[in-house]
């Protein structure tokens, strides 16, 4: 079982784009503790991505080439009740 620095993760959830903050931070605060260890590790990897990548994925402009990252994006959108109509 991995140990996660909660303060560091919360800081990493703060992004340079308000649109991302409104999706990622609430997901972290409400859902992170309920994720599996694999999902937690994937979420941490997702936070290492650029804001531009996250925006593209979360607003369905593109799909992540990494299947695990795309599954996490889909989970975030589902849990946060985000509906993006393209």
From Swiss-Prot:
Transmembrane regions: none
Example GO BP: succinate metabolic process
Record flagged with keyword Amino-acid biosynthesis: no
Pfam families reported for this sequence: Sdh5
InterPro entries membership: SDH, SDH_sf, SdhE_FAD_assembly_factor
Domain of life: Bacteria
GO CC annotation: cytoplasm
Keywords from the named record: Chaperone, Cytoplasm
Coiled coil: none
Localization per record: Cytoplasm
Family note: Belongs to the SdhE FAD assembly factor family.
Role description: An FAD assembly protein, which accelerates covalent attachment of the cofactor into other proteins. Plays an essential role in the assembly of succinate dehydrogenase (SDH, respiratory complex II), an enzyme complex that is a component of both the tricarboxylic acid cycle and the electron transport chain, and which couples the oxidation of succinate to fumarate with the reduction of ubiquinone (coenzyme Q) to ubiquinol. Required for flavinylation (covalent attachment of FAD) of the flavoprotein subunit SdhA of SDH and other flavinylated proteins as well.
Name by which UniProt lists this protein: FAD assembly factor SdhE
Organism: Mannheimia succiniciproducens (strain KCTC 0769BP / MBEL55E)
């Amino acid at each position: 079982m991995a140990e996660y620095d909660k303060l560091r993760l919360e800081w990493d959830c703060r992004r340079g784009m308000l649109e991302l903050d409104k999706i990622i931070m609430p997901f972290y605060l409400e859902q992170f503790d309920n994720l599996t260890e694999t999902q937690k590790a994937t979420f941490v990897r997702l936070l290492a991505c650029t804001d531009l990548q996250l925006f593209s994925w979360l607003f369905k402009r593109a799909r992540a080439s990494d299947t695990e990252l795309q599954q996490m994006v889909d989970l975030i959108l589902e849990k946060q009740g985000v509906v993006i109509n393209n």
